[in-house]
């Protein structure tokens, strides 16, 4: 049955208008975004197929093209639409980190870093450069490595901090292996980085390790204290 023949209270778009987006299930929100399904399959049924296949929104939005396009009703246009969603969310979070309130919300920082790093198959090292009010001046990818190793040069991080006239820095990298526990090389690198930044009066606020949906904070675990 076509969605147009459903009771108004069960149609995702009408339900959203009446009750707000929070009242919709993941599949219903996806259906609103996809707009149409396929022959003999409504947008809601297509959305449910996607959720059954991938199990979560995170897995869906980070899935490769071949896996998504293997679902009947998912063409390249719809796949492209899906790719835009996490990027829009990442940019929205980046804007929130630039507001006068700065980094008052650790959850926003975690979400931003998770959206930026979790989908990547290689280890990538990023830096958030902050002003004296903890507002983000810039976010830069500085190093990219193999699946299990990234060469990080503290002097380059310090150089970029000076270029941005940053008062403090947050660094982060991902573990594509799925384990967010810092390695000994992570701890050693953080010690070197903290010392290099200290020489130019720039504070290292935190180092995050991102692995899938998990984010490890050096600051929260007291590991920054041992790094200086």
From Swiss-Prot:
Name by which UniProt lists this protein: UPF0758 protein Reut_A2732
Key words, A-Z: Hydrolase, Metal-binding, Metalloprotease, Protease, Zinc
UniProt keyword annotation of Zinc present: yes
PANTHER family in alphabetical order: DNA REPAIR PROTEIN RADC, UPF0758 PROTEIN YEES-RELATED
Any one Gene Ontology molecular-function term assigned to this protein's record: metallopeptidase activity
Annotated positions binding Zn(2+): 173, 175, 186
SUPFAM superfamilies: JAB1/MPN domain (SSF102712), RuvA domain 2-like (SSF47781)
GO biological process: proteolysis
Family: Belongs to the UPF0758 family.
Organism taxonomic ancestry: Bacteria, Pseudomonadati, Pseudomonadota, Betaproteobacteria, Burkholderiales
Chain location of the short sequence motif JAMM motif per the record: 173-186
Ranges of residues in domain MPN: 102-224
Residue intervals passing through the bilayer: none
